Amino acid sequence: LKVDLAKPIDLSLPLHAGEGQTRAWWVDPVSMEAVVWEGRPMLVAEGSSVNFCSIRFNPHGHGTHTESVGHISPEVHPVGGMLDRYFFLAQLVSVRPLDRRTAEGVTDHVITLGHLREAIGDRIPEALVIRTVNGDNARDGRDWSGSNPPYLEAQACEWLRSIGVLHLLLDLPSVDRESDGGALAAHHAFWDHPNTVDLKRTITELIQVPREVVDGDYLLELQFPHFMNDAAPSRPVLYALI
């Protein structure tokens, strides 16, 4: 296996304070505020010797993040200590969600089992990176709250698990419908929870795949801080195979 390490493809969204930060789930904007020491903000511009800020954010609601089964289980199962390696063979696929009218008269945009069967073919990747194509590919700076974003069918996630996909990455706020009554059927299907407690699989949401990157096989580097939490901000990176 030969990989072009000189040209990393960053799939993460930047995290910054204030308006214009990508967010979802009705969370407040990210805050980055200087610690006040002896009545003075710890900012070089204010005369301090260093910049020293506290950051308040939500991993699920502010930008690219990776989560463990702890997201839907009574136990936390920290994502920070899960992985015993950080490089995985990955496949990038582009999918145009199917418009589906609900009983309430709402139009959902659904990634189906058929979509993924066709896109993946006979190749079984360790990691699947899904780029949605739905007329609006902008991700950075978008507030997804209340927009009924596209989502995956539970059957699609169940199938991904059955063929051996370990890491699922997508450019949406969630694998599940924004308002589903708390069912989180796709999350449960991918992790087979509560039947099992799967500590090998992760879901990464709110990535951004550059337009110029073509579908195909890559090496994925999946890194995130050692947070003892069900989710952590992450920086997935693709490398082209040569």
How should these model regions be labeled?
Residues 1-242:
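Active-/binding-site microenvironments in catalytic and ligand-binding cores
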